[in-house]
Amino acid sequence: TGTPISNSITEMYTMQRYLQYETLRKNGLQHFDCWASTFGETVTAIELAPEGTGYRAKTRFARFYNLPELMNMFKEIADIKTADMVNLPVPKANYHNVAVKPSKFQQDMVAELAKRAERVRARLVEPYEDNMLRITNDGRKLALDQRLMSPMLPDHDDSKVNACVENVFRLWQENSDKKLTQLVFCDLSIPKNDGNFNVYDDIRQKLIARGVPADEVAFIHDADTETKKKELFAKVRKGQVRILLGSTFKMGAGTNVQDRLIALHDLDCPWRPRDLEQRSGRIVRQGNQNDEVHIFRYVTENTFDAYLYQILENKQRFISQIMTSKSPVRSAEDIDETALSYAEVKALATGNPLIKEKMDLDIQVSKLKLLKAN
């Protein structure tokens, strides 16, 4: 597996229970509470609140303790090979974080989400009337495009969607001679052909209006059989279809169209680090004829995007402690490069320069700790 721990620290315990239950039993670690108190520690930190406004103190599993023992035990059942050990010939990825300003409506709506969240927390509404899941979903949609909240709203010029169209078109134009291709990932607002507004059709129409031939823009959702998928992928590999839009679920693992890929665009942020990894794995891959590729991540400032990247950063932090070629330190809280890049995106999305400064200082401290540990 490429992602033994995809979402939560507890997956490590589950993996061990399946594969080395006897070892756990001998060490008195067969119950999760014992395992957790031996190898994990809860850390309280100031985090962004889910609705995108304000902060809260949150206690979570964030640190592994006694890592050498944990890893020695884990390595009885696992061989770990990371990308830096295998050293495959893959292109160098350049990351571009694109932060856009929210519209007046988006700002008002974020404040409204905050009020709703307060009501839910204070138990003033029944769960069937409103709940954090619903607020979270609205927050994600709002950060992507305000028209997802109401199709009557105007198209905001500085939206993520328009910033993405701008970049996609520019790269399409610049690389026309080589017929280089691009992927756009978006898990929300997929095309349903029901006449309602969706981001996919919006992007396609805008690209066609700028002069991109209609047959060069495709949706993964149109290829609804394995045969159609194979045909579509072949077209992308040849450079006949040069812009392909899809969701992580449909266009993640198993999508091998890397041959001419020059850029990948993350229009929204998934819940799990492995999903973001699956996305970038489409382009940073053996068999790509380009030496350098570009990965764009779009965030709307002061919205739910900040919270999502924070979640990814927290999850990536402990995954990186396990999936590493380096020898384990006694206690690990050191963030790795992937977690750092999520932190930067999060800082951008908060729109508060002091938060950015705090992130930068945290990152510096992390790097100094790393140097000290080495």
Identify what each model region corresponds to.
Residues R272-N290:
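Conserved SF2 helicase motif VI
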